[in-house]
């Protein structure tokens, strides 16, 4: 375990917004008097009607979370209109296409026009405040316009990652009963077309079978590829936006009106619609963006995430735009046309702040230093990581090779549910330890508890909970508040349970050790084991499946599947490939199984519960200490699992 410390350097300290003394003072104020602290910082956004109530939250009983509840504001207004007078000509988005020769810049004035036109199109077709609009888009500016246009008129957006399958998209349309979809003819990733419109058509068909009718589909022309067309339902984006005015007044929204739903994986099979609201979310996204990245006006900021994930919501669109920043949006992938693409983009657009995932770092590290060295990267001032813990070796490579040992790394821990950074270094305030997310952001009160719920003091290892609310926190699971209470507040009464394990060292630094529930973290993306299991079991030859994670050198966690076949069905490599294809079709490519082991049975207790602990150990090629297997209904199953494991160290 790395305990090497990289102290804050003089040049970083000299220009930092927050130094150590200020961090300690503000942090103390934020936890001792949250009403006063957030009452002040809530004013970083503009309000049509100022709030008088700041915090009204309870983690017990029915669980209710309200911030700034009597204030009126609008997210789109805060991200665009209020900047126009002083910064209308500032670039809001730099868009870098999949093709390295194609890019464009969109100023705040232009953004205003694009968003207002799209908002007027939505209104013209009957979209009203509170209606749910599904956005299934590639990384093109229109994806951000769509989010902001919804926010402008009070519609609730549900962005679905363009890598998800039609089945996954259909399920999300049904869950929030969305009747309007915004998509694209095709996406482009690594030179390959992605059939988004075709997927949308299939998803709408799936939704219709569950009695949810999509009435309109607005289609952006990206590639000009051939697509199916339903006259009366399907509309071309470029035709519709040309017919409406370029002005649309923002709707006055209550702070607790819904802003968006974003589906994330849970430990049960059905994805959860995480609901974020208007005021608290924007205050928190903007404040974390400014202080975590030490953002100064004029900085060029690039987060490599996709808008289909929360990182894209908070740190490509809402946080940066609320701060009048220039945000780079990249359509492509890190290894196209070659493994130097990220570094070429940094030079091309003079990027100052670069925020990416450990998976990308590990894979580019494996490609060799020469791809990095051929670029200058001299504009870089700050590096960030997000999505999963970063191993110290990758951290050091990122720091030394990519950042030339002069750019601090902010290793940010947070979740879809938290809306913004929770535990993170602040560049001018926090000495860095490779692999540690370091210290809590303002207002965040982490605690470690043991399995009985006892709070652990000092250096300790335990389950990470948050003791009190913060403005960016999700408010509920869409349409299922009971599930919200059960998932997050029932394990440790009166505390928000993160689902992560964590170690706190003697300096009070936090080290995230990974999920403690049945959720996988694959390449920084969350996937429920139950989702993958139900995809496998839906195949006609599969009788039962159990899925666990195992250490993977690039993705962090790989997906290891134990599959029991129907009687009389033989396992084969061809069937393995067929099952991989089947899971990709059901969920999407991110859920592709890495290893599939056919097994006559699974280790179950006499009550029928699968003992996942044993499956995890075998998947990790570590079966010397399987613990007590005497409670198993059929202990012989374990010997078969060990003998036929797919990841023997010598086979690697």
Curated annotation (Swiss-Prot):
This enzyme's EC code(s): 6.2.1.1
Required co-factors: Mg(2+)
Enzyme class, broadest EC rank: ligase
SUPFAM superfamilies on file: Acetyl-CoA synthetase-like (SSF56801)
Catalytic reaction list: acetate + ATP + CoA = acetyl-CoA + AMP + diphosphate
Biological processes annotated in GO: acetyl-CoA biosynthetic process from acetate
Assigned keywords, A-Z: Acetylation, ATP-binding, Ligase, Magnesium, Metal-binding, Nucleotide-binding
Binding locations of ATP: 387-389, 411-416, 500, 515, 526
Binding site for Mg(2+): 537, 539, 542
GO molecular function, one term: acetate-CoA ligase activity
Matches recorded under CDD domains: ACS
Residues annotated to bind CoA: 189-192, 311, 335, 523, 584
Positions of post-translational N6-acetyllysine modification: 609
Record-level GO cellular component terms: cytosol
InterPro entries recorded: Ac_CoA_lig (IPR011904), ACAS_N (IPR032387), AMP-bd_C (IPR025110), AMP-bd_C_sf (IPR045851), AMP-binding_CS (IPR020845), AMP-dep_synth/lig_dom (IPR000873), ANL_N_sf (IPR042099)
Post-translational modification: Acetylated. Deacetylation by the SIR2-homolog deacetylase activates the enzyme.
HAMAP family cross-referenced by the UniProt entry: Ac_CoA_synth
Cited function: Catalyzes the conversion of acetate into acetyl-CoA (AcCoA), an essential intermediate at the junction of anabolic and catabolic pathways. AcsA undergoes a two-step reaction. In the first half reaction, AcsA combines acetate with ATP to form acetyl-adenylate (AcAMP) intermediate. In the second half reaction, it can then transfer the acetyl group from AcAMP to the sulfhydryl group of CoA, forming the product AcCoA.
Name of the protein this chain belongs to: Acetyl-coenzyme A synthetase
Organism from which the protein derives: Rhizobium rhizogenes (strain K84 / ATCC BAA-868)
Organism taxonomic ancestry: Bacteria, Pseudomonadati, Pseudomonadota, Alphaproteobacteria, Hyphomicrobiales
Encoding gene, per UniProt annotation: acsA
């Amino acid at each position: 375990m790395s305990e090497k410390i990289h102290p804050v350097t003089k040049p970083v300290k000299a220009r930092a917004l927050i130094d150590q003394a200020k961090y300690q003072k503000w942090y103390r104020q934020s936890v001792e008097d949250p009403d006063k602290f957030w009452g002040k910082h809530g004013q970083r956004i503009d309000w049509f009607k100022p709030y008088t109530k700041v915090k009204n939250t309870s983690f017990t009983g029915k669980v209710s979370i309200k911030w700034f509840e009597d204030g009126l504001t609008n997210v789109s207004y805060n991200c665009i209109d209020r900047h126009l007078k002083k910064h209308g000509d500032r670039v809001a988005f730099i868009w870098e296409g999949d093709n390295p020769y194609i890019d464009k810049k969109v100023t705040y004035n232009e953004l205003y026009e694009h968003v207002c036109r799209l908002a007027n199109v939505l209104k013209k077709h009957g979209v009203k405040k509170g209606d749910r609009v599904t956005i299934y888009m590639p990384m093109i500016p229109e994806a951000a316009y769509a989010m902001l246009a919804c926010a402008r008129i009070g519609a609730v957006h549900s962005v679905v990652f363009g890598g998800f399958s039609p089945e996954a998209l259909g399920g999300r349309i049904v869950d929030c009963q969305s009747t309007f979809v915004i998509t694209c003819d095709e996406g482009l990733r690594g030179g390959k077309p992605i059939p988004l419109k075709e997927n949308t058509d299939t998803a709408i068909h799936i939704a219709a079978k569950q009695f949810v009718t999509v009435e309109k589909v607005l289609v952006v022309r990206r590639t000009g590829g051939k697509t199916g067309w339903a006259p009366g339902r399907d509309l071309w984006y470029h035709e519709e936006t040309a017919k409406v005015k370029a002005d649309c007044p923002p709707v006055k929204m209550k702070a607790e009106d819904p802003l968006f739903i974003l589906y994330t994986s849970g430990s049960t099979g059905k994805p959860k619609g995480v609901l974020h609201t208007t005021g608290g979310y924007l205050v928190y996204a903007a404040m974390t963006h400014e202080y975590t990245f030490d953002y100064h006006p004029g900085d060029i900021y690039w987060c490599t995430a996709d808008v289909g994930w929360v990182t894209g919501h908070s740190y490509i669109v809402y946080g940066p735009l609320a701060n009048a920043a220039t945000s780079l949006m990249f359509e492509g992938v890190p290894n196209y046309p070659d493994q130097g693409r990220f570094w070429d983009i940094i030079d091309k657009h003079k990027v100052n702040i670069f925020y990416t995932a450990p998976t990308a770092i590990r894979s580019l590290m494996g490609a060799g230093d020469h791809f990095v060295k051929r670029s200058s990267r001299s504009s870089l001032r700050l590096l960030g990581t997000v999505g999963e813990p970063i191993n110290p070796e990758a951290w050091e490579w990122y720091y030394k090779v990519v950042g030339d040992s002069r750019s601090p790394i902010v290793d940010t821990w947070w979740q879809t549910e938290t809306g913004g950074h929770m535990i993170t270094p602040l560049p001018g305030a926090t000495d860095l330890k490779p692999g540690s997310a370091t210290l809590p952001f303002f207002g965040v009160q982490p605690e470690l508890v043991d399995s009985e719920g006892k709070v652990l003091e000092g250096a300790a290892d335990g389950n990470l909970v948050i003791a009190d609310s913060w403005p960016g926190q999700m408010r509920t699971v869409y349409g299922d508040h009971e599930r919200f209470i059960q998932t997050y507040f029932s394990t440790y009464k009166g505390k928000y349970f993160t689902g992560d394990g964590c170690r706190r060292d003697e300096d009070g630094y936090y080290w995230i050790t990974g999920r403690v529930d049945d959720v996988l973290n694959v390449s920084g993306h969350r996937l429920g084991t139950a989702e993958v299991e139900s995809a496998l079991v839906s195949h006609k030859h599969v009788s039962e499946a159990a899925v666990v994670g195992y250490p993977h050198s690039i993705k962090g966690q790989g997906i290891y599947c134990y599959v029991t076949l129907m009687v009389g069905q033989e396992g084969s490599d061809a069937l393995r490939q067929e099952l991989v294809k089947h899971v990709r079709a059901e969920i999407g490519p991110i859920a592709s199984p890495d290893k599939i082991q056919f097994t006559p049975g699974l280790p179950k207790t006499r009550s029928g519960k699968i003992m996942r602990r044993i499956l995890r150990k075998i998947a990790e090629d570590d079966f010397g200490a399987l613990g007590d297997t005497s409670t198993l209904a059929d202990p012989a199953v374990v010997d078969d699992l060990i003998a036929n494991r797919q990841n023997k160290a010598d086979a690697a």
